[in-house]
Amino acid sequence: MKAKHLVWARRISQTFFLLLFLFLLIESRLPQDIFVDYSLVFSAEQDLTLHQPVKFFFELSPLVGLSSLVSGYQIINGFLWGAGVLILTVLLGRVFCGFVCPFGTIHHLVSWVKPSLKGDRMVKANQKTRSQRIKYFVLIALFAGAVMGLNMVGLLDPISFLFRSLALSVLPGVGVGLRVLFDAMASSDVKVFNYLSFGAEVMASPVFGYSDQAFQGAWFIGVLFLIILFLNRIRPRFWCRTLCPLGALLGLCSRVSILRLEKDQDKCTNCQLCVKSCQGAASPMPGEKWENAECLACFNCFHACPENALSFKFSWPPGLNPRPDMGRRAVLGGLVAGVSFPFLGRLDGQLSKVSDPRLIRPPGSLPEDDF
């Protein structure tokens, strides 16, 4: 397949899955009786209730399924979807990151729209750095905590992080802004604005809420979300390269991928266009060792090369690439951090609860600690 076809296929896939995620997110916020009302309008026998909630995207994350298996010794519903993603990664590399992940698509968009880095600054920003090892330490810490019985993967899993940020912070914040706007339009002396405010509020309220919504920690979640997005202006796809534990897991699996980048150094003119367009800082330039664990399968390098010095082909790996560059102390630090999570989480006094001796229990009832 030609390079431009691969790039367009990736763009179409990214757009589809991002819109699907947003659609299912909005559907999960709609009152269920609204579907009943719409069903009655169209047909008494037609059910417009959606049966594919947004949890489908959570099931696509093998990180969620594996952590649940490790921490609770149970296989969650939809585990096979995550297993399929792992198998696909072994075959084709991190195509989930490049083609499917809605959070990755948002980072890609933020990095792409009016990029603040150009020329030599972009080349420098797209060089592999030691900071890309951090995501492996995060992965180790999360799995170590899961082994100890504390599953904290939901905090940093990209699908969970995106859903939490949008549902608890972004959408409620937009709702507050819209209600202020609608109130201003409704109080206007211009009749057209009055009618428009009523119609817009009827359409928007089911999605953004009929009243102001407040969630504990929403400000922190929203600010953290914006900071992570802003970091893309400094280093493209900062989250994907540096922090994403799912990316680390898929990166480990992609080391044996049979879809590999082939380089023809004789054709290379050192224009560095491949480096400028690389989303994963995977060293695509001929003469450098390709970091397939960091490659996000965006195929930008393949498309950008004017000399056809790069191509993706199916071939058996000559051997396992060296394991990620992680020192023993750093790995040990990740393990210690993960093992410490369950104990640090109980420093608020939950570990030493004492039943109130003044409580009176009915005859035959069990102590509170047994509940």
Q: For each of these PLM feature ranges, what is it?
A:
Residues 1-288, 293-294, 300-371:
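Non-ligating segments of multi-cofactor redox enzymes
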